[in-house]
Amino acid sequence: MAYRKRGARREANINNNDRMQEKDDEKQDQNNRIQLSDKVLSKKEEVVTDSQEEIKIADEVKKSTKEESKQLLEVLKTKEEHQKEIQYEILQKTIPTFEPKESILKKLEDIKPEQAKKQTKLFRIFEPRQLPIYRANGEKELRNRWYWKLKKDTLPDGDYDVREYFLNLYDQVLTEMPDYLLLKDMAVENKNSRDAGKVVDSETASICDAIFQDEETEGAVRRFIAEMRQRVQADRNVVNYPSILHPIDYAFNEYFLQHQLVEPLNNDIIFNYIPERIRNDVNYILNMDRNLPSTARYIRPNLLQDRLNLHDNFESLWDTITTSNYILARSVVPDLKELVSTEAQIQKMSQDLQLEALTIQSETQFLTGINSQAANDCFKTLIAAMLSQRTMSLDFVTTNYMSLISGMWLLTVVPNDMFIRESLVACQLAIVNTIIYPAFGMQRMHYRNGDPQTPFQIAEQQIQNFQVANWLHFVNNNQFRQVVIDGVLNQVLNDNIRNGHVINQLMEALMQLSRQQFPTMPVDYKRSIQRGILLLSNRLGQLVDLTRLLAYNYETLMACVTMNMQHVQTLTTEKLQLTSVTSLCMLIGNATVIPRPQTLFHYYNVNVNFHSNYNERINDAVAIITAANRLNLYQKKMKAIVEDFLKRLHIFDVARVPDDQMYRLRDRLRLLPVEVRRLDIFNLILMNMDQIERASDKIAQGVIIAYRDMQLERDEMYGYVNIARNLDGFQQINLEELMRTGDYAQITNMLLNNQPVALVGALPFVTDSSVISLIAKLDATVFAQIVKLRKVDTLKPILYKINSDSNDFYLVANYDWVPTSTTKVYKQVPQQFDFRNSMHMLTSNLTFTVYSDLLAFVSADTVEPINAVAFDNMRIMNEL
């Protein structure tokens, strides 16, 4: 045996040799205990086996039945010093373990509504920049000129399509698009103001500062800057702020101001924000002890139901999202309190079993795995799995009849769909062949794998006993009822389970089974089954209460679920040991546990935040897909767009999602309509593409190709360069048209006739690489002939900056030499900065306060748990 007698009274005739042997045994046991505690604390798993010496001693003990029964009773006493050893050594393999995966829980809880981020600056694509002016002879003048340039000119070098730049720009706008703007929060002091006036944001202030200090600024402009300040209209709760913005940026910010998502907030809205079932639950006392100011605002969460139907044909994604929901749900299911003492319960069970030597092997297993940790774990697993609709699998030992009888309670209260079919069939088959069929003397059921009927469905047709057949009928038809509550699809338990009446039905069936003769089985077998049933039936009242408690906690937490509870079996399962179900049935006390209001609010907030973020990311992805389609980038960017969408949901491991699900997700996203604000923003970008291209230093509007040398020309912004500002006199061919048709005969003929040709269309403008090679990479079939006929190395566009302080190029002393190029880049002039045209007044509310956590205003408490009532206005736990 693994446990030895210590300090037990010996018979009076024990000799000295026995006493010496006893001392040696005590020392050996002490060493074993020290080693055992080390093993328990270590994470290394090892199989616990008896040593040869202990086996020999056990053989000797078996010689006397009296000694054997004493040995057994000593184990069952489970004194305090033995308790941990028993739980961790004998029962270690039967206790279910759960790793909380805190990283996933943290990811879920860290998803905050992005709307609440505070805007400190206006949205801008452009910024004014000073550029030098070059004289006709190429020298740089001392004076400067202001132009609007792109703030983030992020066009990468190399093979890059300008249309991709606009797609990335749109993505950037969607990321930065504020859901509300409060100008008062971002306003800063105007340093050059006479009366400490304020301008709309820090960038406007820095632009004003730079212009004020520029020597060429007119006096009238300086005087205007000194007068720039906010204008308050207190009666209308409105304030106007001066701003310096490019007209396109002004259009963006004006649109954001006109389409803010904030709505007035009052007590009624907060009250209605609380799930209705929690508001109406008499166990929770909710109070709002403050009135909100009239300037209170909130952003309504976007709680549209799942438009992608992730449960339908997205096995990997569905598994991930249900796992995350399961981990979150486990963290909020309350812990059981005041469970029956494990020691006392095992003692009582051993008395009920009237354990004797003959029944040691079968009936001592009944006590295996019974401990409070397993009971609590089972309670949490059942509720969390139902809340997240995670499929469960059952682990059990067929010879442990107590586990199977507990499994009958489990199958009674939990719908069949919650278990993976193979596991459900195995458990039902074990119950049928171990308990039900032997009771009536029926032959073993030989179940064929793949049979559409479950063992219980087959048994229901063959069992003549009304009570047993009635119970089997209930289990076979135990399904969730789908009920839409507050627009959310809920999976609701059967009313007979919610009020606990089904347990009486189960007990009637068990009593009928225990009264049967088991004609084909030995007497010991019949007695073992009867005693197992007796153990469970002795706790009828507690089982009714447990069932009501389980249903109440499930439905209360379910009120905080905001996404439709779709029931689809998951790829992976949550393991449930039937020994832990036995622990729950045997150790449940009479203490009611219900979720604390703070826990409910936390669970509700996390669900709302994830759901709202999910919908916003869908809207972003749909908008980007539509934009890619309209920019003719549909095929090129599609998978990257879907991957980006999944990454922004935080919980998915994108690299492991199969490609077929990625493309299915793309197809679903493609069918959804674009949200209005996002569509308007894209149209704003489309209308102003030309202005944005002009402001970039890396985008040109075309390229001129010639066979003969073309002289460099003076440009006011760059000096002597091969940049053309107009296309007068050149034959023009549309670059997009050329790429689409693939007809390049026209361009080839022109070049062979030494006629310069201008290919017009946006293209990357990189000064140190070949324009032709860049174009050729866009479509090799179109430009292959051109590249083959010409020396590509001679076609590099050259950017000559000729002035005294330039390191780029120095003129040689040969005045007959004229720098030339065989290509010119066609680049339109960016918009010149005009202070008067850039001055805009922006209007917003003078002040309002946005509240993100609405439930912070609600103070909540519960009634004394002992008084908590279920849906039928009866106490949840009646057995006191």
UniProtKB/Swiss-Prot annotation:
Protein's UniProt keywords contain RNA-binding: yes
Domain of life, per lineage: Viruses
Main location: virion
Biased composition, class Basic and acidic residues, residue ranges: 19-30
Record keywords: Capsid protein, Inner capsid protein, Repeat, RNA-binding, T=2 icosahedral capsid protein, Ubl conjugation, Virion
GO-annotated molecular function: RNA binding
One of the record's GO cellular component terms: viral nucleocapsid
Chain spans, region Disordered: 1-38
Post-translational modification as stated in the protein's UniProt record: Sumoylated with SUMO1 and SUMO2. Sumoylation of viral proteins seems to have a positive role on viral replication.
Region annotated Hydrophobic, chain positions: 394-414, 422-442
Subcellular location: Virion
Span list, region 5-fold hub: 1-80
Site (Interaction with the intermediate capsid protein VP6): A220, F224, M228, M839, M841
KW Repeat (keyword) present: yes
Similarity-based family: Belongs to the rotavirus VP2 family.
This protein's domain notes: The N-terminus binds RNA. It is necessary for encapsidation of VP1 and VP3. The N-termini of 10 VP2 molecules form a cylindrical hub underneath each 5-fold axis of the inner capsid.
Subunit and partners: Homodecamer; each decamer is made up of two conformers of VP2, called VP2A and VP2B. Interacts with a VP1-VP3 complex. Interacts with the intermediate capsid protein VP6. Interacts with NSP5. Interacts (via N-terminus) with NSP2.
Function: Inner capsid protein that self-assembles to form an icosahedral capsid with a T=2 symmetry, which consists of 120 copies of VP2, with channels at each of its five-fold vertices. This capsid constitutes the innermost concentric layer of the viral mature particle. It encapsidates the polymerase VP1, the capping enzyme VP3 and the genomic dsRNA, thereby defining the core.
Name of this chain's protein: Inner capsid protein VP2
